[in-house]
């Protein structure tokens, strides 16, 4: 093939230009993302049982739905929560690659089977089945510049005018409002109700009657008289609109003819529909909307669309209303991709300089440089064809590919230059001869490297998706690189290179010194190799010791899934003791805000807090803060990284009394959890009951707290059992007094909860009407005695006459995992430990708990456990495939052994570099390790290929052949290896956005390549001679 293109250079150029055009078009159309669709798709089923406590919801709703979710294709695990507000949520997580649409349809079909078994009140409320991500993409906050709008004004405007348009924006899965729109609030006074012989149900029924939209029909409607001349709509009654109009609702007419109006027994006002959350931006009243990404949607596109929509809507905002973004994960995605692009350019420049240093000929150097954009753009075209995106993983693959793809072109150019110099041939003839010598080696390198990366494409789960991105990117670039090295590169060599002048090229002073030094080094290397081959047994023992060291390093290197990143944002949770009020929670959140805005003012840009909300559940004792940091360019230095900021905050905020305040970083993959660290589900496998499971959980937390050198921040991601005020109704006594149980329940529910009645019109929008006891009449236990129920004879009877009260404890939020009662435990690895170490430590602690208590990993930890199980198989398959590929290529069993023995030399370098830098054995390291395996084998192939050829064609002995081959190939091996090492150097020294991933990939590969080069050039000749002798003996035997 090479000879064909040497004679047709224009054709070679045409193919290269077509590849570049295709790649250019692909780049313009490829979507950009931080990661591909790594996270498995999730489907969430949400239901509401009004008035039910957590246990009732779990027994009558959650379990009924769970028990019908069997036989779903690709279901990995299922988690659920039931809370005291009557809410049930079941989240089903499916295998990566499962179609979210099909999963949603299957879940809906299974839900239909459960519907007849659910309470009627649940069915009336409706059950939703959503496919949005559980994680927050961004938060838009709304504030009043001059303070003219209070938090309820802001929240009402946002709920009425902004929430719905945003929820319809492309890519948005769901939105969550931090605040509430207005509602008509009817605050009842029990003493006045009793005075007029009224109960809450009377008020509700009259509101329903008098605040109603009636369809009055028409005058002159069809069918009509033949001479009918009039047609008009009849308006009978419309909905009320103001508190004054509601206050005039007639409740009853007394015997003396006087009227009792709603305002006589209640205070009527325009208030919030929901008072459960309080939002603040930098301590000022605010409202917010959390945007959650639709499953499979692109984060950057969605964020852009949301901001464009808000910008459009801002033209209609009240004068003082302003939008800010206190939490946005997309700037990190943009900047991290830009950083990798920058790394790509830096790698190309460094590779060019290395090639120029060794080739010392601009014409020769420009040829491999031309191959770089051709192959890279061609790879983008392939990525587009297979449906990939421009993301961190594919860009890392490109950076690694630069060192690989110039290798082929360097090998071609270097050998052509050698043939021109040694054989005094013109460039075209020299290129023909050179390609005959190295064509098989190029194919061998391509086969080996493709064989290394191919098994990665068949791994499963989120880890498999990461491997697949690297695999397809690297294999595509490698195959294109070999094609270019056998088409465009020889054509360029034949046309661009010049014949060697008499006496050879005259290098400048710098190159002359380099050449002199290199020639001396080459001679020293040749002499050293000859010495090594006289005592191969000794050096095989050294090799075995290196292998033993590799095994020790493997066991010593901590494991994790993905490295943590400084994403420019993080969160802080605050949890107060059970029963704490919103007033206390708001004060704690203000302390958190003050700390970040004063002690960390050089790093923190804004703080947005939400009282009453947390990932562990909703409640007055819960709070969450979204902290946005200043740009990375303004936070230079390790002390200003998110990790350092969190560590300082953890110490400072631990001093806040009567609250557990915990700052935490975001997970590497947003859709796989809400926090970094580990995520464990403690399971009640033995059906021990809620109390025993709580005791086991507390024991686990106590054991974990005793080992701060292993794990830190171990905490339950749930709500503690809270005091509950139980009203025991004596049904027999109530019946004897003529009081209906339904009336008792209605009175208690309305007074101490609230009752939704119907709707009213406010500023052209339909809003809700609620009836509830006034604040003074539902604050204390004694308030229960202020409420009366009318009996069958019309007499008012106090609740205390037929009921008793007592204090008890109960859970406001119950959890289940795969249909088993559970409690979620979150935590972080201690300094110097990886999440893999922390997970193993926690698993050992669970083994000390009472029988019947088990555990399971979920979220990011589930994927980490899965990846650690797959890694050994991946390494083994890759090595076997490489061995078989070499055996098939060389029609020999001995040559593959000579090549494969070099692999541990690269691996020990990768492990040593990773260990010295304090990094862990994560997915990026594993990809780097496979790259190291391929590159180690490549260097060995370059030497062994020439040795075999000399043995076959010139009849040399194995020792003579391998010494000469090693001498001849030393220069291209060092050149390609140094080019690759410097190509990944920008990854190793990267800092700022995305540096965690860049360091993880670059460090292992650089260390592995350095060791593989320095050690392999000495050990490959030893391996070759030892293997040839062993196989020769075997054949004789």
Curated annotation (Swiss-Prot):
Cytoplasmic face of the membrane: 1-9, 360-369, 414-440, 493-534, 892, 949-972, 1028-1037
Please list the residue ranges that the record places on the Periplasmic side of the membrane: 31-338, 391-392, 462-471, 556-870, 914-927, 994-1006
Q: Where in the cell is it found?
A: Cell inner membrane
Matching entries from InterPro entries are given as: AcrB_DN_DC_subdom, Acrflvin-R, MdtF-like
Entries under Gene3D superfamilies matching the protein? Multidrug efflux transporter AcrB pore domain, Multidrug efflux transporter AcrB pore domain like, Multidrug efflux transporter AcrB TolC docking domain, DN and DC subdomains, Multidrug efflux transporter AcrB transmembrane domain
Q: From the record, what ranges are coiled-coil? A: none
Where does this protein chiefly localize? membrane
* Membrane-topology annotation of the record: Multi-pass membrane protein
Annotated Pfam families: ACR_tran (PF00873)
Query: Which keywords does UniProt give here?
Result: Antibiotic resistance, Cell inner membrane, Cell membrane, Membrane, Transmembrane, Transmembrane helix, Transport
Q: Give yes or no: UniProt keyword Protein biosynthesis.
A: no
Self-association state and partner proteins as the record states: Homotrimer. Part of the tripartite efflux system MdtEF-TolC, which is composed of an inner membrane transporter, MdtF, a membrane fusion protein, MdtE, and an outer membrane component, TolC. The complex forms a large protein conduit and can translocate molecules across both the inner and outer membranes.
What role does it play? Part of the tripartite efflux system MdtEF-TolC, which confers resistance to various compounds.
> Which family does the record claim for this protein?
Belongs to the resistance-nodulation-cell division (RND) (TC 2.A.6) family.
* Name the record gives this protein: Multidrug resistance protein MdtF
Annotated source species: Escherichia coli O6:H1 (strain CFT073 / ATCC 700928 / UPEC)
């Amino acid at each position: 093939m090479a000879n064909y293109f040497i004679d047709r250079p224009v054709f070679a150029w045409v193919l290269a230009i077509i590849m570049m055009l295709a790649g250019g078009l692909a780049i313009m159309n490829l979507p950009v993302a931080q990661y591909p669709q790594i996270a498995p798709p999730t489907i969430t089923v949400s239901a509401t049982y009004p008035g039910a406590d957590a246990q009732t919801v779990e027994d009558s709703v959650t379990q009924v739905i769970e028990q019908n979710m069997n036989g779903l294709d690709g279901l990995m695990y299922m988690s659920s929560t039931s809370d005291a507000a009557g809410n049930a949520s079941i989240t089903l997580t499916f295998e990566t690659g499962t179609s979210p649409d099909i999963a949603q349809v299957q879940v809906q079909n299974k839900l239909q089977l459960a519907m007849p078994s659910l309470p009627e009140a649940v069915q009336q409320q409706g059950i939703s089945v959503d496919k949005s991500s559980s994680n927050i993409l961004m938060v838009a906050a709304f504030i009043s510049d001059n303070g003219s709008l209070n938090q309820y004004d802001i929240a009402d405007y946002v709920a009425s005018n902004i929430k719905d348009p945003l929820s319809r924006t492309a890519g948005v899965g769901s939105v969550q409002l931090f605040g509430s729109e207005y509602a008509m609030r009817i605050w009842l006074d029990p003493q006045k109700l009793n005075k007029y012989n009224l109960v809450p149900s009377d008020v509700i029924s009259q509101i329903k009657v008098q605040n109603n939209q009636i369809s009055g029909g028409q005058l002159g409607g069809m069918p009509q008289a033949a001479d009918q001349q009039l047609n008009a709509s009849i308006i009978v009654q419309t909905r009320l609109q103001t508190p004054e109009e509601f206050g005039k609702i007639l409740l009853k007419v007394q015997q003396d003819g006087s009227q009792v109006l709603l305002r006589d027994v209640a205070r009527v006002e325009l208030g919030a529909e929901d008072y459960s959350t309080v939002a603040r931006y930098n301590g000022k009243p605010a409202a917010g909307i959390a945007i959650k990404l639709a499953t499979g949607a692109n984060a950057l596109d969605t964020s852009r669309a949301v901001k464009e929509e808000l910008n459009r809507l801002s033209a209609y905002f009240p004068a003082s209303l302003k939008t800010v973004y206190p939490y946005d994960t997309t700037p990190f995605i943009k900047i991290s991709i830009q950083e990798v692009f920058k790394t790509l350019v830096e790698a190309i420049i460094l590779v060019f300089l290395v090639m120029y240093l060794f080739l010392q000929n601009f014409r020769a150097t420009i040829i491999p440089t031309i191959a770089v954009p051709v192959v890279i753009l061609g790879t983008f075209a392939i990525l587009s064809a297979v449906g990939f995106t421009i993301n961190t993983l594919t860009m890392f693959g490109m950076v690694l590919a630069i060192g690989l793809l110039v290798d082929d072109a360097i090998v071609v150019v270097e050998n052509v230059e050698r043939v021109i110099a040694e054989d005094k041939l013109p460039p075209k003839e020299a290129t023909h001869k050179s390609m005959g010598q190295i064509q098989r080696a190029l194919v061998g390198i391509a086969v080996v490297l493709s064989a290394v990366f191919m098994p990665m494409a068949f791994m499963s789960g989120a880890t498999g998706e990461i491997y697949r991105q690297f695999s397809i990117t690297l294999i595509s670039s490698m195959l294109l690189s070999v094609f270019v090295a056998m088409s465009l590169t020889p054509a360029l060599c034949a046309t661009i290179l010049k014949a060697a002048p008499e006496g050879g090229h005259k290098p400048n002073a710098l190159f002359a010194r380099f050449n002199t030094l290199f020639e001396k080094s080459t001679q020293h290397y040749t002499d050293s190799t000859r010495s090594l081959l006289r005592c191969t047994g000794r050096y095989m023992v050294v090799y075995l010791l290196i292998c033993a060291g590799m095994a020790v390093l493997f066991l010593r290197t901590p494991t994790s899934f993905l490295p943590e990143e400084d994403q420019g944002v993080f969160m802080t949770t605050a949890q107060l003791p059970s029963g704490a009020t919103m007033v206390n929670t708001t004060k704690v959140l203000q302390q958190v805000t003050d700390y970040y805005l004063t002690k960390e003012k050089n790093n923190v840009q804004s703080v947005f807090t939400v009282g009453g909300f947390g990932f562990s559940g909703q409640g007055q004792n819960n709070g969450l803060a979204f902290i946005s940091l200043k740009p990375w360019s303004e936070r230079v230095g390790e002390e200003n990284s998110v990790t350092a900021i969190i560590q300082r905050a953890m110490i400072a905020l631990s001093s806040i009394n009567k609250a557990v305040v915990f700052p935490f970083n975001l997970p590497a993959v947003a859709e796989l959890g809400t926090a970094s660290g580990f995520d464990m589900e403690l399971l009640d496998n033995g059906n021990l009951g809620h109390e025993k499971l709580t005791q086991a959980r507390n024991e686990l937390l106590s054991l974990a707290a005793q080992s701060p050198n292993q794990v830190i921040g171990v905490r339950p991601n749930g709500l503690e059992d809270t005091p509950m005020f139980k009203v025991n109704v004596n049904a027999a006594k109530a019946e004897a007094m003529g009081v209906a149980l339904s009336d008792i329940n209605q009175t208690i529910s309305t007074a101490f909860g609230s009752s939704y009645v119907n709707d009213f019109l406010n500023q052209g929008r339909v809003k809700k009407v609620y009836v509830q006891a006034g604040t003074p009449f539902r604050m204390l236990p004694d308030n229960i005695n202020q409420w009366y129920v009318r009996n069958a004879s019309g007499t008012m009877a106090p609740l205390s006459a037929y009921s008793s009260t007592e204090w008890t404890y109960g859970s406001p939020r119950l959890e289940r995992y795969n249909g088993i009662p559970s409690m979620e435990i979150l935590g972080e690895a201690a300094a110097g430990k990886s999440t893999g170490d922390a997970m193993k430590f926690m698993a050992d602690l669970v083994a000390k708990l009472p029988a019947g208590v088990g555990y399971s990993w979920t979220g990011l930890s589930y994927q980490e456990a899965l990846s650690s199980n797959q890694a050994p198989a991946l390494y083994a398959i890759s090595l076997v495939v490489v061995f078989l590929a070499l055996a098939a290529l060389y029609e020999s069993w001995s040559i593959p052994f000579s090549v494969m023995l070099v692999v541990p030399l690269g691996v020990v370098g990768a492990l040593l570099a990773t260990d010295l830098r304090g990094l862990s054995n994560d997915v990026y390291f594993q990809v780097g390790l496979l790259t190291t395996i391929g590159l180690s084998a490549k260097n060995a192939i370059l030497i062994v290929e020439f040795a075999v050829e000399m043995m076959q064609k010139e009849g040399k002995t194995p020792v003579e052949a391998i010494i000469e081959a090693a001498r001849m190939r030393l220069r291209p091996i060092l050149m390609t290896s140094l080019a690759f090492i410097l190509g990944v150097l920008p990854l190793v020294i990267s800092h700022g956005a995305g540096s965690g991933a860049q360091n993880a990939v670059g460090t292992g590969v650089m260390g592995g390549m350095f060791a593989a080069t320095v050690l392999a050039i000495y050990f490959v000749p030893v391996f070759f001679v030892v293997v040839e002798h062993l196989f020769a003996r075997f054949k004789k035997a």
